[in-house]
Amino acid sequence: MANEFRVCDDCQATNIKTLLPRLKEADPDAKVEVGCQSYCGPGRKKSFAFVNNRPLSAPTEDELIEKVKKKIKK
């Protein structure tokens, strides 16, 4: 089963232009959905993504990508 990433294009702490390419680099075959994830509170302060329906957040995008890499199915 392929991995799935869901990210918000409206949250202040998430830079979609840099995050999407890095997620695709982590798993080129993953399904990616972009849109509101109703995660506005944490999304205001931390970079976040849903990975296989699990929310992951971190103070920086670099830290988030490290968490994502640990959670994706190989």
From Swiss-Prot:
Full protein name: UPF0741 protein RBAM_034720
One Pfam family cited in the UniProt record for this chain: DUF1450
Organism: Bacillus velezensis (strain DSM 23117 / BGSC 10A6 / LMG 26770 / FZB42)
Family listed: Belongs to the UPF0741 family.
